[in-house]
Amino acid sequence: MPTIQQLIRNPREPKRTRTKTPALKACPQRRGVCTRVYTTTPKKPNSALRKVAKVRMTSGFESLCYIPGEGHNLQEHSVVLIRGGRVKDLPGVRYHIVRGALDTQPVKNRKQRRSHYGAKKPK
């Protein structure tokens, strides 16, 4: 336990908070190139084939990104836009791919929550 005099001389340093999305480097989104597109299975209570892409970002990081929505057109060398946001049942997936931006097509026949999937308003 330090004395008051010791605290005046050398005050306590606040703990630094670690960022949840280090690959974005404090930017809202980042561009990247897909190096591998595949499906993976989620953690224990859930069961599915989740679509995932390994992306090399302009910040130099390479990380796993989730492809939201039903169906996608991504393949190796596709240019994608990345946003933050983890997928709770996929370990190591801390980013989402933005649908309807760059090479990623929007989700077809989407009627509700369209802005999340880059879909235009149906006529």
Curated annotation (Swiss-Prot):
GO cellular component, one term: small ribosomal subunit
Subunit structure: Part of the 30S ribosomal subunit. Contacts proteins S8 and S17. May interact with IF1 in the 30S initiation complex.
3-methylthioaspartic acid: modified positions: D89
Keyword Ion transport: no
Classification via InterPro entries: NA-bd_OB-fold, Ribosomal_uS12, Ribosomal_uS12_bac
Keyword DNA repair assigned: no
NCBIfam families hit by this protein: rpsL_bact (TIGR00981)
HAMAP family linked: Ribosomal_uS12_B
GO function term, MF aspect, one: structural constituent of ribosome
Organism of this sequence: Hyphomonas neptunium (strain ATCC 15444)
Any one GO biological process: translation
Keywords, alphabetical: Methylation, Ribonucleoprotein, Ribosomal protein, RNA-binding, rRNA-binding, tRNA-binding
Family per record: Belongs to the universal ribosomal protein uS12 family.
Stretches for region Disordered: 1-28, 104-123
Ranges annotated as biased composition (Basic residues): 108-123
Functional note: With S4 and S5 plays an important role in translational accuracy. Interacts with and stabilizes bases of the 16S rRNA that are involved in tRNA selection in the A site and with the mRNA backbone. Located at the interface of the 30S and 50S subunits, it traverses the body of the 30S subunit contacting proteins on the other side and probably holding the rRNA structure together. The combined cluster of proteins S8, S12 and S17 appears to hold together the shoulder and platform of the 30S subunit.
Protein's name in the database: Small ribosomal subunit protein uS12
UniProt gene name: rpsL
